[in-house]
């Protein structure tokens, strides 16, 4: 059987960079890791609660965390930041307060910045959310996959592969369905590939969505 390695970890240091940048003593490392998870969960929960879109998408591509001795810098890359910022300018401050309360950090300053990504549908996380929304609304999985591929074609990507696994369309036996458009060279380390795995809960059970997007060759 072919061994499947995570395409992001496989390319760390060449085409992929870390989403968390900080140093810690070996004994304190696990605390820092837990802190990162708390920050990410807190932000996602806040965005879910405050953004109401018809498709139920959060639109978060990734959250980068940089830590120094006296400062935690958080950059949220979003596909549709207007939905969070335009309603109330106070929202970012409120989010900052929430994260600070969650972390209970007294002697460190917290700074949150929101950056818009140029092609939202060229990002696998946002696409996976889109497909999840479609599947929850009982759209047929093939239709959802094809629509996702159409959206990425507008974002000038070189190739995409979408895979859905589980009880598709409520069938008794779980199966894996996939579709590929263009090139997706998973073995080439120089190829910049974005990847995301996403779990969606439907009325029939849990489905797994995996998306590989071939962005560019370095």
From Swiss-Prot:
Residues 47-118 form the KH type-2 domain. Disulfide bonds: none annotated. GO terms for cellular component: chloroplast; cytosolic small ribosomal subunit. One of its GO terms (biological process) is translation. It comes from the Eukaryota. The keyword Ribosomal protein applies. GO terms for molecular function: rRNA binding; structural constituent of ribosome. Transmembrane segments: none annotated. InterPro entries: KH_dom-like_a/b, KH_dom_type_2, KH_sf_prok-type, Ribosomal_S3_C_sf, Ribosomal_uS3_bac-typ, Ribosomal_uS3_C, Ribosomal_uS3_CS. Keywords: Chloroplast, Plastid, Ribonucleoprotein, Ribosomal protein, RNA-binding, rRNA-binding. It is found in: Plastid, Chloroplast. Gene3D superfamilies: 3.30.300.20, Ribosomal protein S3, C-terminal domain. Belongs to the universal ribosomal protein uS3 family. Part of the 30S ribosomal subunit. This is Small ribosomal subunit protein uS3c. The gene is rps3.
